[in-house]
Amino acid sequence: MKIEKLVLGSYQTNCYVISHNKMAVVIDPGANGEIIGTLLQNNDLTLEAIFLTHGHYDHIGAVDYLYNLTKCKIYAHIGDQELMDKEASKNILNFQTLEIHAPIEYFSKEFESFTILKDIVFDSIYTLGHSAGSV
């Protein structure tokens, strides 16, 4: 398993690409979908899923780009569904609204396990505080 950290966008959001056996999961694709897409392509990786730790603008910016590129699954906690559905997160500093058109699979448990890369399990722990759906 390989974990690669990318620092993306004007907010310098940490994005993680976790890969194993030519499959990948992206955690918090904040911006610059082209950079993430190039990394996937250059390493011959198939994006299986995007996992969002919360729905703030600076963590979801490349969701649609990557979904349109790969048709991967997207996971987020249901606590942030309203945030992402209403205006899909607003960048208050730039007065922009980011709309997400990709389908998001919301989960609601405080502790959830996902087997995404066949033999690797990802555990999500609900951590209310930063947003209503922080994990």
Regions found by a protein language model. Name each.
Residues 32-120:
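Active-site HxH/HxHxD metal-binding segment of metal-dependent hydrolases
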Residues 1-45, 101-135:
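Catalytic core of the metallo-beta-lactamase
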